[in-house]
């Protein structure tokens, strides 16, 4: 299980990236492939942009 810390405006959010909730995220192609290839994880100092519903999250993890 991996934790993603993302930023929306000035607020920080923590997400547990699991196989179940991963499918609920709408991401751009690069993040989709990157998360998929890395088993829903992430690399340090990677920029991420995730859209979930009407809310956009952007941050560096």
Predicted segments, located by residue:
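Short, mixed-charge low-complexity intrinsically disordered segments
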Residues: 32-61
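Short cationic/low-complexity microdomains
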Residues: 18-40
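N-terminal acidic leader/helix
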Residues: 1-26
